[in-house]
């Protein structure tokens, strides 16, 4: 009995996490024509579409499509060094660039992922992009 309790406790300690997953915040789609994509979501699908927002520090222009339970972020290159331009060079028709899932402790989640060998693309505060 003692061995089982010890093994259970060891497993619990090993699998405990200082952070947990939350809701899906948004799905980001890189698009080759932002006006066409915006028109599609607004006029054809009758989506609640925001205006364009240039984010030169991130090399993107964004438009959000607000859905009842999440958002779609349309991404278009801004400037010559845009990471979206590189993505579109490989994916001419565009496609899903990333998903954003909320966590209850971003710093702990980043540290934990990095410790597990997961490459982090950005170690800064990402809240400014999505907390509108």
Give the ranges of each region predicted by the language model:
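Short, surface-exposed, polar/charged, turn-prone segments marking secondary-structure boundaries
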Residues: 57, 77-80, 100-104, 127-130
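Helix-adjacent hinge/juxtasegments
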Residues: 71-97
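N-terminal beta-strand motif that seeds the catalytic metal site of vicinal oxygen chelate
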Residues: 9-36, 94-103
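Short acidic/polar alpha-helix capping motifs at helix-coil junctions
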Residues: 3, 17, 25-28, 73-77
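Core segments of cupin and vicinal oxygen chelate
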Residues: 19-22, 29-72, 109-111, 115-123, ...
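A short alpha-helix capping/helix-coil boundary motif
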Residues: 16-18, 40-41, 87-90
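Short, solvent-exposed interaction modules
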Residues: 88-118
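N-terminal chloroplast transit peptides
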Residues: 1-8
């Amino acid at each position: 009995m003692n061995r089982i309790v010890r093994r259970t406790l060891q497993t619990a300690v090993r699998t405990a996490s200082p952070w947990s997953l939350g809701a899906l915040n948004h799905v980001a789609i890189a698009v080759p024509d932002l006006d066409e994509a915006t028109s599609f979501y607004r006029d054809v699908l009758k989506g609640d579409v925001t205006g364009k927002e240039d984010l030169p520090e991130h090399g993107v222009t964004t438009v959000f499509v607000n859905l009842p339970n999440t958002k779609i972020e349309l991404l278009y290159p801004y400037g010559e060094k845009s990471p979206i331009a590189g993505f579109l060079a490989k994916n001419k028709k565009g496609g899903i660039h990333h998903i954003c899932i909320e966590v209850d402790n971003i710093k702990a989640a980043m540290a934990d992922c990095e410790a597990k060998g997961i490459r982090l693309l950005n170690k800064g505060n990402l809240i400014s992009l999505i907390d509108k």
